[in-house]
Amino acid sequence: MNICDNRIAANFLKKMKILITGGCGFVGSNIAVFLKKKISKVQIDTLDNLSRKGSKLNLLRLKKYGIKNYRYDIGNYSKVKRLPKYHFIIDCCAEAAVEVSKRDVDRVLNTNLVGTFNLLKKCAENKSNLIFLSSSRVFSIDL
């Protein structure tokens, strides 16, 4: 059974507030648009620092659906803490490019590790649910 096809679930979700991190990326923006098309009354916001190519184009598409973006760095807890309370946070944010991981380890750790920890703290404070999506790329570091 598809949750979006179930009327009871759809009525329940209309009252939901959902934040999608990495929401202007490929995966995040498609999830946001899919949910908005299926359940138009659900409040969907995104959090994205717009640092990747294509993010600004996706932002324009999201605006057409009434989806607001917070241009924050997920690794900055003082910004994450200011976000409103959400029922669900869908974490699509990741620094997944292998080349970036080789030349800017701090950036990768700040986004992928510290950022996820910041979301967990925010969820714990607000009793929100977290849906975590992993990177499409897994790589190792030679020690």
Residue ranges, per PLM feature:
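N-terminal Rossmann-like NAD(P)+-binding domain of SDR-like oxidoreductases, especially those catalyzing
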Residues: 1-143
